[in-house]
Amino acid sequence: MKEFQRMLMLQYSKHGECILKEIGAAFRGEHPADLTIVCENKVKLHAHKLVLAAASPLIRNLLEDTHLSDCSTTVYFPDVNATYFKFLLDFLYSGQTCITSRDVNYLHDLLLLLQIKSDSWKTTDSAYLSSKCGGLRDRADRRKQQYTSPQNLEPDQTLKYEVDSVDESRNAADFSSAFNSNDNCESAAECERSGGHNNKEEDEDDCTHKDNKSDKDTDEIVNLSNAPPSGTSGSNSNISTSSNHQQQQHHHHHHHNHNNNNNNNNNNSSSSTINPVNLSLDLRTKSENSASRTLGSGSDHSGIDLAVTASESTKRKGLFFDSHKDVMKPLSDGSDINSSPENYVVTPHRKRRPGFHNTQSDNQPFTSYPHSLLEELRLAKSTTSPISGFGSEKNMLAHLEDGALNGDTLTPDRKHLLEAQRNRAQSPEIPMHLGPQFVYQWQSNQNAAMSAMPNLQSRLSSLSHISLNLDHPEGRSGSASGSGANLAGSNTHASSVREYRCEYCGKQFGMSWNLKTHLRVHTGEKPFACRLCVAMFKQKAHLLKHLCSVHRNVITTTNGADTENRYSCCFCSMCFESVQELVRHLSGHHNNLLLTKNLRE
């Protein structure tokens, strides 16, 4: 019969971690670089083909097209500044980089040059978008100086624009053209109020068009402080009157947060060119797109402010850092630690040995039993006392003596039993003669003093043996002594003394063969051997288990595909239906063949 080799699946659980460590080691210069990049002014940067080819399709195509025998390859980028390429290498090797907001556009252009898709990265700071919208901010300042004056400008009114789903590849001219689409309105706030449902529908269409265009968008908020709240043009005079009530509502809504908004907006406008931007590899989910469309399609943008961004940042930090209250909170007590599911210790089940199907509860622990003479005397008195032997029967007849039951309802047998119990004569005291086997042989050192006590035999012999009878002294004495013997036997079994003690470790055993098997642990004796592979074992059960597992192909007999397997003996021609029957056969008929001393026969 042809045997097919089994296929094994090998899995390396730390594969990803090792790859990241190797990439970090390559970035630190521990591995020799095989790719040289020549940037502007002939500045050379060293990198690795594996990392750049995995990130940039352009580099991968160049390496595939040029089959060079040389180990090192040089790629020229004469129009790329080396500083930005260093930022890109840091970004590709470590997964994130920190740059100023003014360099985002150059880094983005470099990513586009290397054909790295921009939908796999996003920014965590809105300052770079404010720098890209510098033309928009300058235009708003010019419109403020042209159409407003210090007399009609209220200090607590701010204008907030929300640029939703803005593409990073768009330049400042795109924002200027988008702003020029509303030139029919003199003021941006008037445009928001006068647009009505038409502007809302146009904004929704624009957002839908931008979201369907690509997934490369990021949601950013641009705050322009001290912008004109209303216009002075005559073409919009009829609209300003009708929207006066709406303007008051907006003023009331922004009244509580105008100080914080002004401060944050001034800080953003003043430090927009020096704030660092953290670029991290992160895929944008569809839920963020839906949330941005929901926020961008509404006509009232007053509820979107920096507090929302701060709360979201706090929530994100809460996922990774514990609060100070939780850190300083002490443990209540030890019960919480012990009762937690993580502290449960799972012990494996003991494997069943072939032929020995004893349960875990049958194995009593090896604990020494402290014996005392007083307990033995108390036990002997309780087993021979008439009260203990027939206490239950006397309690059963107690309510009859008190007259709880009517005498007419008793049967003749019960009446006879009651009279015999009431008029029972005192049994004569007969001295009990104890044989030498009744006296315990004290083996332990702690009971040596008790075994040396004088008159121990006379004290035990002084106990009286009382014959208990109800009807006939001769007939009931046998049953009483039998019940007393049963009680004594059960109590003796419950408090059995482990008389066999190991001289190496001090463990005590109740059976001699248990001690004999235990001594093999210390002596190293292996009296059982396998005749098929000459393996030796300390216990016969271990040898039988070895035969049924390692040499299973030897003892298994196959008669066909439709019939069940049979188990044949390796020492004779007998076959069995189950492994248990074979184990009993080997342990009984061929017990001598399992011994090490008979291995040469």
Swiss-Prot record:
CC annotations in GO: nucleoplasm; nucleus
Composition bias, Low complexity: 235-247, 259-275, 476-490
Keyword Metal-binding: yes
Alphabetical UniProt keywords: Developmental protein, DNA-binding, Metal-binding, Nucleus, Repeat, Repressor, Transcription, Transcription regulation, Zinc, Zinc-finger
CDD domains referenced in this protein's UniProt entry, alphabetically: BTB_POZ_BAB-like
Subcellular locations according to the entry: Nucleus
Protein name, as recorded: Transcription factor Ken
Taxonomy of the source species: Eukaryota, Metazoa, Ecdysozoa, Arthropoda, Hexapoda
Gene giving rise to this polypeptide: ken
